[in-house]
Amino acid sequence: MDEFQRDGTNHRSWQQFFLYPLFFREDLYAIAHDHHLDRSSSSEPIEILISNYFSFLTVKRLIRRIRQQNDSIGLFGNCDPIQFIDRNRNSYSEPVLEALTVILEVSFAMRSKHFAETMSGWKSIRSIHCIFPLIEDKFPHSNYISDIRVPYSIHPEILVRTFRRWIRDTPSLHLLRFILHEWRNSFSAENLQKALVVPRENMRLSLFLWNSYVYECESFLVPLLKRFYRSRSLLYGSFPNRTHFDRKIKHIVIFPINISTKRIWLLKDSFIHYVRYGERSLIALKGTHLQVKKCRYHLFHFWQYYFHLWSQPYRICILELSKNDSFFLGYFLSFKIKPLVVRTKMLDDLFITDLVTNELNPISPIRSILLFLAKEKFCDISGHPISKLSWTSLTDDDILDRFDRICINLFHYYSGSINKDGLYYIKYILLLPCAKTLACKHKSTIRVVREESGSELFTKSFFKEQEFISSSFSKTRSQRERFWNSDIIQIKCPI
């Protein structure tokens, strides 16, 4: 992989014009084959897997047949590509997909790096919680939030047109078109939605195609937003008499009282902030409702004309910041008006200024967490505990560790919420299924388990986490103070 990137750095032309020869390099298929072996859970010897699964000669023959086949794609011929490729699917389907993914990832990484260098202010971060400080700092200065769901139902031809912007050699595009039409069921809306929620290794190519598509959208959208932000409108008033406007404007000093009420002011400073995680995007805007509606109108036409994709109107919701709550990354984001009184003393004069700001109040969805626990059979929908009979075959330490990690993940992720009391209620609900599971395993009662375990019932690592948090912050601060964890990349709940 490093060798390919070094070669691409020295010779940038190959990533745009000569991708096709990379399909005939054996070391590339060795990398792809190693990827498949690493994630394979089979206990067969490696020699048997290689002989039965992978044949580089078969892959070469496949690519040669695809190149010579004039009607290999169902859209332009009468042949059935599924019958054409199913005969040897077990021998080369995974290596071809893995090799295609490796080639596209290397070329795309170099292109996105060049784009990030040219775009000032563009930041790509991995931590989930790094988004919330940005929202807390920037969004309160806005009036509206545009909640966008990025379309994930993508036709293969749209992806091919997207890749044509940075891949110029025709053989690679033909091979890519054939593969996309053949595996189009893997890139359907349902499969992509599942892959975005629960990423899997076998959806690597699907996730790459979707991310590259979103990246292409953002590469056009973000510069347009930055241009709109920099083009600030100047203030001007509505004059009742516009006759000889150029001559009269120099002599106007102040408006009469009866006209000042009709004065119309345009927006002077436009604030636009864009945040995306997964298939959800938030655009915070400061302006009038008409300007926000125009922004949504332009987004519709942006997707329609640039990417030949019709987006449903319900995918872009306009929310007024002070009246509506937005559900984003597991939080209910609400902005409340917070009045501030500022006193400034200059010599003998005392000035008092009233300021009104918006404060972010992230709320953890206790009801949704409770429904999730009920779905996973920890309790019913009313919160009554249920024992995990499938865990009774585990040791006591494993059972305690699993419940402990679930509780830690919840407190770790929702550390920025203002309703900590609800999290302690969830912890109490998890405490009872843990004791009930241990009681079912040892054929005893919950009272006996709690008397034997005492305060050590899945609280060891929890108290270690609390000690770390308390040592990081001053003791004079409130226990209800919110904080964000910048080390959260993905929450893996052991259920």
Curated annotation (Swiss-Prot):
Keywords: Chloroplast, mRNA processing, Plastid, RNA-binding, tRNA processing. It is found in: Plastid, Chloroplast. Coiled coil: none annotated. GO terms for molecular function: RNA binding. One of its GO terms (biological process) is RNA splicing. Pfam families: Intron_maturas2, MatK_N. Its main location: plastid. InterPro entries: Domain_X, Maturase_MatK, Maturase_MatK_N. One of its GO terms (cellular component) is chloroplast. Belongs to the intron maturase 2 family. MatK subfamily. Usually encoded in the trnK tRNA gene intron. Probably assists in splicing its own and other chloroplast group II introns. This is Maturase K. It comes from Torreya californica. The gene is matK.
